[in-house]
Amino acid sequence: MSTIPISRTNSGGKVKGFWTPIPPKFPRIFFLLPLFCLSSLAVAQTNLSSYTPGSTYWGRNNYTEYIAGNMPLIISAPHGGDDYPSELPNRTNTSTYTVTTDPDLWTANLARAIRTACSNRYGRYPHVIICNVHRAKVDCNREIVEGAQNNTNTQTVWKEFHAYINIARQQVTNTYGRGLYIDLHGHGHPIQKNEIGYDLSDSDMFKTTFSTTDDNESSIHALSERSRQSFTDVVRGELSLGSLLEKRGYPCVPSVSSPNPGVSNGVTNAYFNGGYNTQTYGTSLANGGTIDTIQIECNYTNVRAKSSTSSYSEDVAVRANFASNLVASLEEYFKYHLEMTMDTQATPPPSVNSFSDKTILEDGFTSTSSINLASASNTFWGESSDPNIVDASGFIFGGSGTSRNLVVRPRANAYGSNVIVMVYQQATNGGVGTDWYYLTVDPVNDAPIFPSLSNRTINPGVSLTIPAIATDVEGASLGYALVSGPAGCSVNPSTGTFTWRPTIAQSGVTYPVAIRATESGTGGLSSTLNFQTTVNSATAPQVSTSWISGDAQSSPQVQLSMNGQLGPDYLVWASEDLVNWFNLGTATPTTFPFVWTDANASQYPKRFYQIRLGP
């Protein structure tokens, strides 16, 4: 079959060089992709089921390579080839354009690493298209006139590459309804940042807020229309692809930290915003379609290779690490903006209700959100971006049949802003759709919290110490006061420690105790700790006497052996006439029997003893 390539031109009729920054907005001209003449591939495009996920399909002389996938993700590496076949002439400059021949080193390897990362994570494969021919021979990110010039064999390589892209796009569309195509490149700019291209010009990138026209002409217009975020946030907000990669340690532009390329010495820093592939296959309003396209221009250090002097094994590890983090970032990106999981297995994924952002007070509940299931057999669940604020137990689902609902209950005393509440719905055929909203939990001033405290039972005379220390969620300093309690007790005003030693007179009674903790400052909240302390009844001691150290003529001593209750003081009193009593001493035994010795007993013809309890 014969085909006529149609090139995008500028107003002067000259073929546009897509390696240069995109000029001010211009009318979009559709590019009709010519099918190359190999009958096997031409037939294959109408028989998509002949491509087995995970299998590799080759173009002529293995110049192009298609690894079929079963995910809504397409990866291409048009400039990663290093084959230098003599049958293909080197491309040359013309009067209308200057060719770029530098390859994007290691991008083919990086594309394979991304495929491996997907396989490791999901057991599934992205669609991968690689041009194995050196860029000096063919450029598959330019229109065919510049990319293949006038050589028939070179044009075949170019056509094969783009036919494989269309096969992958059709596979994704047929299977999932929508998806993402990433055109993988490598830049040599001195600033080591990944450059994420959405077909926005340099002047666009310096805008504070993108316009509707910018959105309509971007390569992710369909995704932007689906996302609950503004186009500006989709491009460089906290959930943009650049920011998701950056939080994993890979600086990117645009992102929250680098919303535009920046300026050095009065000159805008170099930034590749997209090329022929993003303009041709992106979902601009003019192009239509549902396969959004992003160009990623990877920096060299710690992305495509460890360094210019590192070993091959070190470089392999670096690429594997970046690929793993890119896949993790894309997993989030799909859920936030494409409303599907990256490992969804059906077309189209079930739709989840759109939710409004919610703001509640700490320790409260959200209002009820309706969830309409496509089928009563579908399953649904939720997760949050911050389990410290909303954990799995905080998702309370209700309803029945296809009419379900959700209430979210944050953890006690937890608060924070912009917590992402994600809801999933999975169909029986494996399709998984998503939607989400921001939950803000505003803090409230909580009263101090005392730890739980059991009632106490003690003997009279036992010193009771209770560290009744309260905590304050907001970290306010606390003061303590005794609200009520038995005579003789006290509370430390700074530490809240309660102390008391009950007297004998207080035995046999249960005493309520109340301690108040109050936040410092005017209007501080307070809490009260209540508990009871029971003082056992005092029991009379048992006493026996004995003589030691000889007879009365050799200064004998009297020993008093006592058994009784631990806690009280034991006061030994003596008298010679049972009228006048005097205290011989006081002891607080820690064990029984307890022995008291009267060393002066032999001085008296008779002596009486009495044991009294105190205090």
Regions found by a protein language model. Name each.
Residues Q425-G431, T518-L525:
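Short, solvent-exposed loop/turn segments at the edges of extracellular beta-sandwich modules
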Residues P348-S385, I389, R411, G433, ...:
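Extracellular ectodomain surface segments
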Residues Q45-T344:
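N-terminal catalytic or cofactor-binding beta/alpha core of small enzyme domains
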Residues S417-V419, G431-Y437, Y511, G524-F531:
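Extracellular and select intracellular beta-sandwich modules with Ser/Thr-enriched
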Residues T347-S351, N445-I449, C489, G496:
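Proline-centered linker/hinge motifs at extracellular inter-domain junctions
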Residues L439-N445, T533-S537:
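Interdomain boundary/hinge segments at the C-termini of tandem beta-sandwich modules
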Residues N388-R411, A487-T503:
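Strand-loop-strand motifs at the edges of beta-sheets in extracellular beta-sandwich domains
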Residues N536-P615:
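Short, composition-biased motifs enriched in small/polar/acidic residues
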